């Protein structure tokens, strides 16, 4: 029979020992290291996004130089998947089975993440803050170890259609979409709003990520008499679309562009800034080219990070503020873990974010999650290209499936 003093001693030991055990039992977690895995398109058709991974590398290096997190240095392992789903599967298996990472962070792409989601959930590996806006990443019952970060493409498309119908109740819409889950979410969002009118007013054309150009698709929509253009594709093809629409003399009354392809440096300037005047998109991040943020505290924090850690980075490239926003969200979660980096606790903290303000998010937009809300950002604001920068208009629009 244990006396009170022995019981207290046993209780103290019980509190201490599991923490040590967790560090030993959780893959990628030791007393001195936290291993985090990621796949990125450092090459291939979506390589413009590769700077996101490079930004993360620089950020974690900075964190380590300042002492790490909970006494541990972060070992960030990022592999190139070339935006190829079979390659993603190969690289993620390598990360999980050979590198034994604690979790996957910000893996990029809808088709690529779709190829690994069953595998990582079967392995119970946190697959968090994906760099993709597919609506399905919010399906917490279907894959409880996976969560996105940015607003979903479906919600974005719904916002565009609601705005369009307020301005033009009888549009003839040409919708160019990438033939994968990413592009199809926009089709679903447009259909959500138009309902039974969809087939009457929408002309659909798709393209493969391996296609060299989308010129023929643009000509097809123009010849069909569409007066509204919706472009749901990645940066390379978005730049081609803007340029081709202008060059053939097509002037749609409205041109909506997915917000994953609005970088000034990688889309608008290559397309020709004057060729995109009037294009409407949505935003949840501060635009690094907008003078409105020249003296903004959050953007000054990001610019200081860039100067010190990525001095040759393009300050016009919106992928960098995106990376800074999502990695700051991760750091918030890791701090909430309070040294317990078990996979279960990581997911517990991921699903308990309340009104988090992130330096590069627009004013009024906050990160929120719960065990039944795996859509961390559900607010957006419309903006229009004026030939030099994106100009926001209207208020912040809130809610998943608006």
Predicted regions and their residues:
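Extracellular/periplasmic periplasmic-binding protein-like sensory domains
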Residues: 245-324, 396-400
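Immediate post-signal peptide segment of exported/extracytoplasmic ligand-binding proteins
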Residues: 23-36, 70-73, 165-170
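Extracellular/periplasmic Venus flytrap/periplasmic-binding protein
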Residues: 87-90, 135-138, 143-248, 292-297
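Extracytoplasmic "Venus flytrap"
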Residues: 29, 37-57, 79-85, 108-109, ...
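N-terminal secretory signal peptides and thylakoid transit peptides that target proteins
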Residues: 1-14
């Amino acid at each position: 029979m244990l006396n009170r003093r022995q019981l207290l001693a046993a209780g103290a030991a019980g509190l201490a020992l599991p923490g040590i055990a967790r560090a030993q039992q959780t893959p990628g977690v030791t007393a001195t290291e936290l291993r985090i895995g990621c796949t990125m398109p450092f090459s291939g058709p979506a390589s413009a996004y590769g700077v996101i991974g490079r930004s993360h590398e620089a950020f974690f290096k900075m964190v380590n130089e300042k002492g790490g997190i909970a006494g541990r240095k972060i070992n960030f392992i990022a592999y190139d998947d070339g935006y190829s789903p079979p390659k993603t599967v190969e690289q993620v298996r390598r990360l999980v089975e050979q590198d034994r990472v604690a979790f996957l962070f910000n893996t990029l792409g809808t088709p690529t993440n779709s190829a690994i989601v069953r595998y990582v959930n079967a392995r119970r590996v946190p697959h968090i803050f994906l760099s993709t806006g597919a609506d399905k990443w919010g399906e917490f019952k279907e894959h409880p170890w996976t969560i996105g970060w940015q607003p979903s493409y479906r919600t974005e498309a719904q916002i565009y259609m609601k705005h369009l119908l307020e301005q033009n109740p009888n549009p003839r819409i040409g919708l160019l979409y990438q033939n994968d889950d990413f592009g199809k979410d926009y089709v679903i969002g447009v259909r959500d709003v138009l309902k039974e009118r969809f087939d009457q007013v929408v002309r659909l054309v798709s393209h493969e990520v391996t296609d060299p150009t989308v010129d023929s698709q643009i000509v097809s929509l123009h010849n069909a008499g569409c007066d509204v253009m919706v472009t749901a594709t990645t940066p390379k093809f978005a730049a081609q679309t803007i340029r081709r629409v202008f060059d053939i003399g097509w002037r749609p009354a409205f041109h909506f562009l997915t917000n994953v392809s609005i970088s000034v440096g990688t889309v608008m300037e290559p397309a020709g800034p004057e060729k995109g005047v009037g294009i409407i998109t949505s935003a949840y991040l501060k635009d690094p080219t907008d003078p409105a943020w020249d003296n903004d505290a959050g953007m000054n924090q990001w610019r200081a990070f860039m100067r010190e850690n990525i001095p040759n980075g393009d300050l016009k490239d919106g992928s960098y503020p995106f990376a800074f926003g999502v990695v700051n969200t991760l750091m918030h979660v890791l701090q909430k873990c309070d040294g317990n980096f078990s996979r279960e606790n990581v997911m517990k903290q991921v699903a308990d974010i309340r009104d988090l303000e992130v330096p590069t998010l627009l004013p009024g937009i906050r990160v929120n999650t719960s065990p039944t809300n795996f859509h961390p950002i559900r607010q957006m604001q419309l903006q229009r290209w004026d030939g030099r920068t994106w100009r926001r208009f209207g208020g912040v629009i809130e809610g998943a499936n608006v």
